[in-house]
């Protein structure tokens, strides 16, 4: 199984973009060349500031959603310290209990 990664890219105007991929370097190069996400096109210099393996695609999608819900301050802490990332992944791996 190919591992998936969560990554954050900082734009020239100091915004943070969150994405997932199986190959961080390839995806970063796509963003740099303007062939990645439309949200990053024309945003000036892009800097890869965080990446971490998250497991399979399902877990990566859930992690991406959760990180996108964080405040800018929380994302900055994640970039600077990895703060809370292990806990975030752990909470996503806990099986959900379904009630009928």
Swiss-Prot record:
Pfam families: GIY-YIG (PF01541)
GO molecular function list: 3'-5'-DNA exonuclease activity; DNA endonuclease activity
Transmembrane segments: none
SMART domains in UniProt: GIYc (SM00465)
Family classification: Belongs to the UPF0213 family.
GO biological process: DNA damage response
UniProt-listed InterPro entries: GIY-YIG_endonuc, GIY-YIG_endonuc_sf, UPF0213_domain, UPF0213_GIY-YIG_endonuc
PROSITE patterns: GIY_YIG
Top-rank lineage group of the source organism: Bacteria
Protein name: UPF0213 protein YhbQ
Organism: Escherichia coli (strain K12)
Residues covered by the GIY-YIG domain: 2-77
Lineage: Bacteria, Pseudomonadati, Pseudomonadota, Gammaproteobacteria, Enterobacterales
């Amino acid at each position: 199984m190919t591992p998936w990664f969560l990554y954050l890219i900082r734009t020239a105007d100091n915004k943070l973009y969150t994405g997932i991929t199986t190959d961080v370097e390839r995806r970063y190069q796509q963003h740099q060349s303007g062939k990645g996400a439309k949200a990053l096109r024309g945003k000036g210099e892009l800097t890869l500031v965080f990446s971490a393996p998250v497991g399979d695609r399902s877990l990566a999608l859930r992690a991406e959603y959760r990180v996108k819900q964080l405040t800018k301050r929380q994302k900055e802490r994640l970039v600077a310290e990895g703060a809370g990332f292990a806990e975030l992944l752990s909470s996503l791996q806990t099986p959900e209990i379904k009630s009928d």
